[in-house]
């Protein structure tokens, strides 16, 4: 008796060649609908699945493989006498191989103006049922969901007359990887359409491999880069950047680029951001990006070395010539003019990335792994909850207020405890990741290469004591923005008044860990 294979595929790459091989190996091929038509047109004899089920396709093809004659054939244990006797009694033949891939759900949800009805019709039911059944019974049944595995299976049959246990187990594992990914897309899409922002009892993310990385954060760590396969994720992200030049991105390059892009989204006016080790080392806004870059370089010409520089405007020849003078890992921008790209590409090891966009749309959750679990939260997209509250005797001037908002945007993206000192929409000093707030203040002040008279200071969380305000006052800081909310706010306000500092409360903090 010939072995039997069911073939029903949406992705028809390589299927004709593989089916011909199976026929050479003595397999009878059972098929459905479009696949049967395609194989027949290519000269391959197939058995209509309706001849096996002895039941017609119904409900516009929604029901065609969901039948005991199919699933009993797939699930029967071929060394179990009772199973074989049952098949014989019911006139059911065993099925030895299932070659199936699923309706294009992912491609459907990414189409513009797709309707929920279109999406629903592209949720496969029969396909997942067959491949899950075959995967469960992998000791006896071979299942293929990936065209890349056709050659492996064909070679083993040609060499050994059968597919090895190890390969069948490997292929079965791929089935559950495939169906879990498929179901995760459906779950997340339905949740999005329903505008359900609650945290689910079970949380899955449809991640698709984008790139194998040379190594992880350190050379002894293996790593990969995955993308989220959902259409409602912001397009302005590192995943959607186009690499125009340079070596492949490293794990750390990707992390730093992500930080740069997220910070850029805070600004509408021409802005330049320099990132090092996932923290901003300098940020500036100006009338054009030429001036913005000059301010960034002046702010911290040391830390920028070996860092990432990102812009929210087109990079021109003048900027590119300045960038070429120093060692940088990556330059990011929405556009590069021809001369600028030529200049940057003359640097062999410089990576040049083009942003897809900088628009803010719906986004996915912020997910952080911990040993044994994961923390899931909303992205910190809010800048200010309410209007600023002036709490000191002196109100900030219009210019101070502009600088305060600028500094507040930056401090939101600095590791806590975080302090940013700024003036003229340019960071003068950044206190990063200190274990107490006064150290963060002292760090930001000491790092500045400029006279801080008239500068402003932003703190990502409240001041627990007045010492931070005192240090700011002694350094010449004229205005402060902070969340407020400490039981000692009164002490900080009194200290600010003593130095004639204008201080405003935001009513919200921006911790970043």
Curated annotation (Swiss-Prot):
Q: In which pathway does it act?
A: Purine metabolism; IMP biosynthesis via de novo pathway; 5-formamido-1-(5-phospho-D-ribosyl)imidazole-4-carboxamide from 5-amino-1-(5-phospho-D-ribosyl)imidazole-4-carboxamide (10-formyl THF route): step 1/1; Purine metabolism; IMP biosynthesis via de novo pathway; IMP from 5-formamido-1-(5-phospho-D-ribosyl)imidazole-4-carboxamide: step 1/1
Output the GO biological process annotations, alphabetical, semicolon-separated: 'de novo' IMP biosynthetic process
Task: Provide any one GO MF term from the record.
Answer: IMP cyclohydrolase activity
Q: Mind telling me which GO cellular component terms the entry cites?
A: cytosol
Query: Does DNA-binding show up as a keyword for this record?
Result: no
Please give the record's comment on domains: The IMP cyclohydrolase activity resides in the N-terminal region.
List the protein's name: Bifunctional purine biosynthesis protein PurH
Species name for this entry? Caldicellulosiruptor bescii (strain ATCC BAA-1888 / DSM 6725 / KCTC 15123 / Z-1320) (Anaerocellum thermophilum)
């Amino acid at each position: 008796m010939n072995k039997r294979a069911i073939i029903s595929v949406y992705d028809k790459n390589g299927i004709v060649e593989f089916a011909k091989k199976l026929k050479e190996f003595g397999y009878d091929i059972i098929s459905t609908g479009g696949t049967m038509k395609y194989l027949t047109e290519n000269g391959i004899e197939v058995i209509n699945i309706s001849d096996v089920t002895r039941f017609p396709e119904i409900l516009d093809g929604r029901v065609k493989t969901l039948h005991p004659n199919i699933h009993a054939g797939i699930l029967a244990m071929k060394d179990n006498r009772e199973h074989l006797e049952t098949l014989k009694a019911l006139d059911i033949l065993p099925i030895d191989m299932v070659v199936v891939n699923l309706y294009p759900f992912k491609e459907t949800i990414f189409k513009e103006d797709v309707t929920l009805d279109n999406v629903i019709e592209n949720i496969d039911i029969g396909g997942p049922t067959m491949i899950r059944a075959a995967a469960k019974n992998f000791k006896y049944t071979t299942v293929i969901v990936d065209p890349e595995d056709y050659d492996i299976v064909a070679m083993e049959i040609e060499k050994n007359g059968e597919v090895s246990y190890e390969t069948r187990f490997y292929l079965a594992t791929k089935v559950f990887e495939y169906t879990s990914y498929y179901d995760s897309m459906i779950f997340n899409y339905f949740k999005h359409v329903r505008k359900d922002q609650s945290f689910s009892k079970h949380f899955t993310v449809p991640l698709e491999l984008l790139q194998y990385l040379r190594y992880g954060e350190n050379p002894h760590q293996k790593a990969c880069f995955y993308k989220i396969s959902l259409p409602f994720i912001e397009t302005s992200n590192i995943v959607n950047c186009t690499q125009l030049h340079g070596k492949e991105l490293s794990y750390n390059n990707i992390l730093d680029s992500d930080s740069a892009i997220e910070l850029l989204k805070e600004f509408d006016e021409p802005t330049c951001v320099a990132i090092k080790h996932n923290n901003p080392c300098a940020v500036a806004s100006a009338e054009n990006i030429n001036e913005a870059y000059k301010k960034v370089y002046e702010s911290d010409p040391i830390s920028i070395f070996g860092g990432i520089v990102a812009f929210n405007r087109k990079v021109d020849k003048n900027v590119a010539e300045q960038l070429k003078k120093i060692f940088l890992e990556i330059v990011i921008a929405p556009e590069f003019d021809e001369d600028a790209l030529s200049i940057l590409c003359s640097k062999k090891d410089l990576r040049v990335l083009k942003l897809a966009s900088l628009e803010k749309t719906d986004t996915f959750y912020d997910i952080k792994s911990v040993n044994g679990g994961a923390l899931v939260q909303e992205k910190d997209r809010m800048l200010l909850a309410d209007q600023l509250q002036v709490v000191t005797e002196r109100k900030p001037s219009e210019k101070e207020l502009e600088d305060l908002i600028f500094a507040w945007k930056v401090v939101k993206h600095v590791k806590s405890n975080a302090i940013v000192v700024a003036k003229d929409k340019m960071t003068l000093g950044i206190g990063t990741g200190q274990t107490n707030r006064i150290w963060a203040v002292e760090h930001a002040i000491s790092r500045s290469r400029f006279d801080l008279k008239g500068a402003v200071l932003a703190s990502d969380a409240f001041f627990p004591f007045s010492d931070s305000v005192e240090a700011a006052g002694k350094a010449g800081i004229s205005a402060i923005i902070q969340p407020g909310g400490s039981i000692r706010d009164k002490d900080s306000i009194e200290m600010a008044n003593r130095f004639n500092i204008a201080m405003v409360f935001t009513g919200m903090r921006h911790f970043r860990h």
